[in-house]
Each structure stands twice: as structure tokens, then as C-alpha cells.
Swiss-Prot record:
<feature type="site" description="Involved in polyketide binding">
    <location>
        <position position="143"/>
    </location>
</feature>
<dbReference type="GO" id="GO:0006631">
    <property type="term" value="P:fatty acid metabolic process"/>
</dbReference>
<dbReference type="InterPro" id="IPR016088">
    <property type="entry name" value="Chalcone_isomerase_3-sand"/>
</dbReference>
<keyword id="KW-0963">Cytoplasm</keyword>
<protein>
    <recommendedName>
        <fullName>Chalcone isomerase-like protein 1</fullName>
        <ecNumber>5.5.1.6</ecNumber>
    </recommendedName>
</protein>
<comment type="function">
    <text>Involved in the biosynthesis of prenylated phenolics natural products which contribute to the bitter taste of beer and display broad biological activities. Involved in anthocyanin biosynthesis. Polyketide binding proteins (PBP) which reduces the catalytic activities of CHS_H1 and PT1L and prevents demethylxanthohumol (DMX) production, by binding to DMX and naringenin chalcone (NC) to stabilize the chalconoids ring-opened structure.</text>
</comment>
<keyword id="KW-0413">Isomerase</keyword>
<dbReference type="GO" id="GO:0005737">
    <property type="term" value="C:cytoplasm"/>
</dbReference>
<dbReference type="GO" id="GO:0005504">
    <property type="term" value="F:fatty acid binding"/>
</dbReference>
<dbReference type="GO" id="GO:0009813">
    <property type="term" value="P:flavonoid biosynthetic process"/>
</dbReference>
<dbReference type="GO" id="GO:0045430">
    <property type="term" value="F:chalcone isomerase activity"/>
</dbReference>
<dbReference type="InterPro" id="IPR016089">
    <property type="entry name" value="Chalcone_isomerase_bundle_sf"/>
</dbReference>
<dbReference type="InterPro" id="IPR036298">
    <property type="entry name" value="Chalcone_isomerase_sf"/>
</dbReference>
<dbReference type="InterPro" id="IPR044228">
    <property type="entry name" value="FAP1"/>
</dbReference>
<comment type="similarity">
    <text>Belongs to the chalcone isomerase family.</text>
</comment>
<keyword id="KW-0284">Flavonoid biosynthesis</keyword>
<dbReference type="GO" id="GO:0009570">
    <property type="term" value="C:chloroplast stroma"/>
</dbReference>
Amino acid sequence: MATALNSKNASSNTAVHIEPKTGIAFPVKLDDGKSLNSVGLRKKSLLGMGIKVFGFGLYADNEKLKNLLKLKIGKSPAKPTEEMYQLVIDGDIGLTHKIVIAYSGLKMNMFKKAFSEALGESIMKLNGGRKNEELANKVLGPASDQIKLATGSEMEISKLPGYVLETKVHGELASRVESELLCRAYFGIYLGEITMECYKESKEMFGQSMLSLF
């Protein structure tokens, strides 16, 4: 990331970056080598209050990303461009979206419903306006509604080689779906040209991280 990442996790001495609005710590590197390129927060308005639902970190295989940017873009632009973001969304590059729950009142069935609705809308935008609820429900649909989502609960949604979207909840595999459309739709939610207001800051941070790779 373009910002300094010098915090340490006292228990493991692992370098972390703190998402400032939630205080959630995200490791600078994952075990598979992906690097943290941005952090962010999902907020939702409830009864006039802004609820902090979850903090998140967006990770990428920065070596492959660097090679792709230099091949397709060449020289570093003055600021991040939509073309750069689209390369990340469309490319067969390893990505991970790490979610850490911040709201203690969240239930798994509530999360799954909101998750699938947002993903379904993103799929529809890429699919000529056609819905594909079956595809959207394949990601978290297999996860049991009985799973507890306490504050600090973690999920990881990763784009693996060959456009495979893998989802883990509490470190356990929930689904693995091979679909280029699904991969593009999922990461387009956070990096696409039209993103929710609460995701714009993390998108810009990801863009600045990409600029540092040139």
C-alpha cells in the first residue's frame, strides 16, 4: 500500500494495517503471498444511524498485477484510471477480499441475503440486464444459517487462477465456483466504475497502491 504499514500485531509480530473507522487490524501479507492494497468499511443506515457492518481488506498478487499494468498501461499515469481498475477486475490475477465483522447484531441469514442481492445486481450489470440469482447464491448459499457471526468473525472471498471464486467462513471452505462472470461481478462491486459511496475511499487507496507498482 502507498501508506505506511509499520504497525505490529503484538501476539505474532506480524505487520498489520489498521482500518481507522473500525480499528480492525489487517495483515499486510496473507499466507499465500498476496499483499494488502487497501482497507475499507461497509456502512448501512438503520433507523437514521450509520451502522458499521464490516471492515475489509483488498489483497492482490502484486507481482502479476505489476506485470499486467506495465504490459497494458506502460508508464505510470498521474492518477489511477478506470482502465487500471478494469484490468484488475477482468484479469486472471489472484485477489482476496478479507471481511471482518464489526456489527455484533448481524445474523448469517441477514448477511447472506444482503450479500447475494448486491452480487446479483453486479452480475446483472455485466449480463446485459439479465438476472442470475442461481449464480449469485452459489457463493454464500452453501454456508449454514446457523454459523455465528460475532464481532471479529472473518470471511475470505478469493479469485483463484482460472477465474475460480473461493469463499471461506471462519477459515472453512463454503464454496468454490468457476465462473469468470462471477469473479468480475464480485470484485466489480468494490473496484468498478460505479461503486457505493462507502467503497470509494478504499477504491482510491487500491488505485494509489497500483501506481506504486510502476
